[in-house]
Amino acid sequence: MAKSHLPPWLLLLLLPTLCGPGTAVWATSPLACAQGPEFWCQSLEQALQCKALGHCLQEVWGHVGADDLCQECQDIVNILTKMTKEAIFQDTIRKFLEHECDVLPLKLLVPQCHHVLDVYFPLTITYFQSQINAKAICQHLGLCQPGSPEPPLDPLPDKLVLPTLLGALPAKPGPHTQDLSAQRFPIPLPLCWLCRTLLKRIQAMIPKGVLAMAVAQVCHVVPLVVGGICQCLAERYTVILLEVLLGHVLPQLVCGLVLRCSSVDSIGQVPPTLEALPGEWLPQDPECRLCMSVTTQARNISEQTRPQAVYHACLSSQLDKQECEQFVELHTPQLLSLLSRGWDARAICQALGACVATLSPLQCIQSPHF
C-alpha cells in the first residue's frame, strides 16, 4: 500500500475517536436515523451519526465491496497509529507544550507545569497507542461488519494518575482540583484548568484549513471511485471534525483520565468570544460573523442553560446589540434544535442561511471530476 504523507498532527486530533465508541461526540435522535438511507446519506455527519457510513459508501456514494472498505479502513488506522510513534510527532507537541508552560501568566505554575509534562506526557502517549484497535474503530464507523465483541479498554494504569491528588479529590470530582502542596503555593493550583488550557492552545495553533487538504491525501489508498468521493468529503468536513474533536473530546478525555477532572466543562468557565475562534473561522460577512459568535457561545454551555446563553451572547461588546437581538428572536428555536443534534457552529449557520454553504457530499458525488 502507498505510503501516507499526512502530517503527524492528524493523529493527535484522531486519538479521542480511536480510543473507542464511548468518546463519540455526535448525537442524532433514533427517530431521525429511522428515516433510512435518504436521511443517512445526506451528509458525512449524518452517516456517521447513524452508523451508516459503510452503507452510504457502498450503495449511494459509490460501489465497493464491504470487505474492501473494512480492510482499507483498518489500513488507514494502522498508518495513523504508526505516526504517533514517530519522534517528530512527539517532539513537536512536547516543545509546544513546554513553551506554553513557560509563558503561563502565573510564574509559580511554571515548574509544576513542566513537572506534569516530564512525568505524564510519555506515559499518556504510550497508553493511547496501546488502546487503539483498528477493527473496533472501523466497526464503530460502520465500515466493518460487527463481529464478536471487542475486549474493553484496559483500565488507566495507576502510574498515569497523579498520586498526590487521589486523597484530596472529593467523591464527585469537580472541574478544578486543589493545590498539590499548600506549603509550596499561596493559592490553589487549578490542574484541570491547566490541562484544558494547554489542549486549547494546541487546538488554536493547528491550521485546520491546511490540514483539510492534507487529510484528503489518505484517500489515495481507497478504490478509484470511492477515492474521489473520499477526497471531496475530506476537504469539506475536516475543519468541522477537527473543531469538534479538539474542542470537546480531547480535553475531556485526556484531562478526565489523567487528572480525574470532571467532564462538565461549563462550570466556572466564561463562554468564548469571537476572538477565541481560529483565524480561518472568522467570516467576513457580518450576519455570518454574528451567527458564528452566538452559536459558538451557546455550544459551550450545558443544554439546560442554552436558551439564556443565546440571549446573553448579544451583550458581547463585539456584536451590534440590536442586530443580534433580531437574529436571536428569529432563529433561536431552530438554532437550539440544531445544537441539540450536535451540529457545529458553521454547519448551523449555513443551515440558517447566515453563512454561505460549500459543496455538500451529494454535490461532490455529482462533480464531473470523478
UniProtKB/Swiss-Prot annotation:
Q: What residue ranges carry the coiled-coil annotation?
A: none
Locate the Saposin B-type domain: which residues?
66-148, 188-265, 284-359
Propiece residues: 25-184, 264-370
- The record lists its disulfide bonds as C70-C144, C73-C138, C101-C113, C192-C261, C195-C255, C219-C230, C288-C355, C291-C349, C314-C324
Specify the domain of life of the species encoding this protein.
Eukaryota
Keyword Signal assigned to the entry: answer is yes
Cellular localisation: Secreted, Extracellular space, Surface film
Looking up Pfam families in the UniProt record yields: SapA (PF02199), SapB_1 (PF05184), SapB_2 (PF03489)
Chief location: secreted
Entries under SUPFAM superfamilies matching the protein:
Saposin
Q: Which GO terms describe its cellular component?
A: alveolar lamellar body; extracellular region; multivesicular body
- Provide the GO biological process annotations: lipid metabolic process; respiratory gaseous exchange by respiratory system
Indicate the secretion signal residues.
1-24
Q: Can you give the residue ranges of the Saposin A-type domain?
A: 26-66
Glycosylated residues, per the record, are N300
Q: What PROSITE patterns does its record include?
A: SAP_A, SAP_B
**Keywords assigned by UniProt, alphabetized:** Disulfide bond, Gaseous exchange, Glycoprotein, Repeat, Secreted, Signal, Surface film
* Subunit structure, interactors included: Homodimer; disulfide-linked.
Function of the protein: Pulmonary surfactant-associated proteins promote alveolar stability by lowering the surface tension at the air-liquid interface in the peripheral air spaces. SP-B increases the collapse pressure of palmitic acid to nearly 70 millinewtons per meter.
Further notes on this entry? Pulmonary surfactant consists of 90% lipid and 10% protein. There are 4 surfactant-associated proteins: 2 collagenous, carbohydrate-binding glycoproteins (SP-A and SP-D) and 2 small hydrophobic proteins (SP-B and SP-C).
Q: What is this protein called?
A: Pulmonary surfactant-associated protein B
Organism the protein comes from: Oryctolagus cuniculus
Q: What is the lineage of its organism?
A: Eukaryota, Metazoa, Chordata, Craniata, Vertebrata
